[in-house]
From Swiss-Prot:
Residues 583-638, 841-908 are cytoplasmic. The chain crosses the membrane at residues 562-582, 639-659, 820-840. GO terms for molecular function: glutamate-gated calcium ion channel activity; kainate selective glutamate receptor activity; transmitter-gated monoatomic ion channel activity involved in regulation of postsynaptic membrane potential. One of its GO terms (cellular component) is postsynaptic density membrane. It catalyses: Ca(2+)(in) = Ca(2+)(out); Na(+)(in) = Na(+)(out). Belongs to the glutamate-gated ion channel (TC 1.A.10.1) family. GRIK2 subfamily. The gene is grik2. Coiled coil: none annotated. Cold receptor activity activated by temperatures between 10-19 degrees Celsius. SMART domains: Lig_chan-Glu_bd, PBPe. Disulfide bonds join C96-C347, C750-C804. This is Glutamate receptor ionotropic, kainate 2.
Amino acid sequence: MQRIAGITKMVTHRRWLGLLLLLLCVGYSHGMPHVLRFGGIFESIESGPSGAEELAFKFALNTINRNRTLLPNTTLTYDIQRINIHDSFEASRKACDQLSLGVAAIFGPSHSSSANAVQSICNALGVPHIQTKWKHQVSDNRDSFYVNLYPDFSSLSRAILDLVHFFKWKTVTVVYDDSTGLIRLQELIKAPSRYNIRLKIRQLPADTKDAKPLLKEMKRGKEFHVIFDCGHEMAAGILKQALAMGMMTEYYHYIFTTLDLFALDVEPYRYSGVNMTGFRILNTENSQVSSIIEKWSMERLQAPPKPDSGLLDGFMTTDAALMYDAVHVVAVAVQQSPQITVSSLQCNRHKPWRFGNRFMTLIKEAHWDGLTGRINFNRTNGLRTDFDLDVISLKEEGLEKIGTWDPASGLNMTENQKGKTANVTDSLSNRSLVVSTILEEPYVMFKKSDKPLYGNDRFEGYCVDLLRELAAILGFGYELRLVEDGRYGAQDESSGQWNGMVRELMDHKADLAVAPLAITYVREKVIDFSKPFMTLGISILYRKPNGTNPGVFSFLNPLSPDIWMYILLAYLGVSCVLFVIARFSPYEWYNPHPCNPDSDVVENNFTLLNSFWFGVGALMQQGSELMPKALSTRIVGGIWWFFTLIIISSYTANLAAFLTVERMESPIDSADDLAKQTKIEYGVVEDGSTMTFFKKTKISTYDKMWEFMSSRRHSVMVKSIEEGIERVLTSDYAFLMESTTIEFVTQRNCNLTQIGGLIDSKAYGVGTPMGSPYRDKITIAILQLQEEGKLHMMKEKWWRGNGCPEEENKEASALGVQNIGGIFIVLAAGLVLSVFVAVGEFLYKSKQNAQLEKRSFCSAMVDELRVSLKCQRRLKHKPQPPVMVKTDEVINMHTFNDRRLPGKETMA
């Protein structure tokens, strides 16, 4: 009985135990799984240490299991398999092994061939495949069991293109590591067809890490804007080799597509001046992210990075951060799937996981704020969307954030412009720059000294002072060098090659060109210019014409010959009009005998001769005894008086100047005069900006001048300004040059003068190589000098000379015969003419008397001459006819001027 009772008791205990197990199973079936396995497949070198992705995979799982915040009732385990790089068969076999164990998801591998093999298996069996490396997505992709946390490279390519636009690059070199780089940068490669960008594509050597031959070609080709598409290890090697080849200077600007640029050791390049830009997806500014990275650095000590990787200790790479976020995203999906169970799957049975579709949907719908920012997926293709990138750039303090980029709003540069301006002095301090210049007064000249001078002390001038002021503001040192070929810089039409200072800037033989270097369109295409420090134009330098003394008839010069002719015509016209009006107006006829009011005879004083005499008297401002009585004749007289008043006043005002000033008559007065003649030769400095202006001009006058100069190129072109000035002084030659230099020369040589005004308008600026970081800094310093008035002070210092005596400063000299001798000639001519007229009148009157007295002409002339020679006699007998004439036969001698009053009868 006891045995039976014991058996019964044991059975009862087993029933209770079974019931308890049943309840536990029921409870387990309605809650989250207690243990869930993830699979990880990672590439590694045989017997090598664990990679960063594998460590991040373990680190993420351990973090979730320790915190118990995300999955409080579930423990995550893992199965890690290692494969050789690019071994897709081994990757497939390892994936099948993990699926047979039962995994909820497979992470990795990284390389595309192995990843594609694993992806096809996961897609067939309905198991999520999680990737953290870039993979090329075809347009008809049907891999529904797939998500990728790496940003889509079409977006990254647009981000790089936005940077190129922001930096205003016109020439870009793309250097890629493998063929997938061309796919990743397709947006940038398409840019030349849509934007004005010249693109050159190069490939890194495939079988070696020696990039020096490629870098040498780039240096020879002056390729300063380069985009490197490679991993962080190759990027670190390229930077070291570029430093050894002298390609880590301020003229080079590199953009790296790797998101691990922030983790590279850039300490050797901080003070090199090189421009280095990249992107960072790791949100290091978040305190929680920083805390996780700090914990990661402790884990990383177990497997530090390889010495040749170029990575800094304690930095979490982008691949590791993406793997960490990938594990957490899948854990979020596990949290949302309470009844998920894993099962063993066989690759040869093609029986998919029954929870696969649901679990994959939960993963694509999951949201997580991870180390790499907000994580969302496109539910169609499984690609990541809505990610943010930090734009980082190398500064003297290291790599700093200068902006952000996201697919929605694009590039947003957030660099502190105020701080950037404040650091202008710091960025150039203690740097030594090579400055190219050219000898030209008063810009750069050799300093006159009894002692031998060396270095920068050999030079003086406006540009030397300007350079000294710029160096004082920006804190840099400099070495002043004369340009080797002595030219400013022009492009050869046949070869397209440049010379002079422009060439030295293009070849980076000089950092600055501080000289009278004009800012032109063609130069701006190959070099950069600062803001102008001087504005000017082209004008004509010519000999000052010799002064000519006024001639004896210079009193006629105040009025032009046309005006003299018009005055004569006006005088004749007014006199005739006055005569006609006076004849027609009844008020100009008057009684010649006022004492006899009954006289029927009236007289008109304005005969034709009297009308001419009236005009002469008014013109000479002497008047006459003739006065108009009618209103009409008074109007004519008043208008004529007003006319003569203005004419005489204008004549008098100009007469003094024309009699006292020596006339400076130049054969040319403007560029038009030069273009219309060929007697006076004219030219410019060869290969200068003035020559470029005439060569490129579309204005007909200047184009005609260029045809003349180009046809006589060897005879009219000069090598320097000094040669041009010498030709002006020694021959009949006009020199076209900058107005500021003409101003300087004419202040010191009174035999030279400027002809006409400015032909064009241009400016001088400080030249820098294309893309030089010094340009903006130089511009700011020039604007500061302008606001302080120092540019004007320097110009006054170097342009002010003794000056030439001004004409108006001369004392008035006494007038000589050569000034007003013509007046005496006119007077003498008038006297001689009056004598001849008097003789004519005497002869004419003698003839009339002879006819009246019925005697000979000679006797009448002798009598008249006898009376005329008796100077004291005032009276003489009036000639009488020999016979008496009847009263009614008396002829009125004024029949032409007298007329009888109307209504009166004629005399009987």
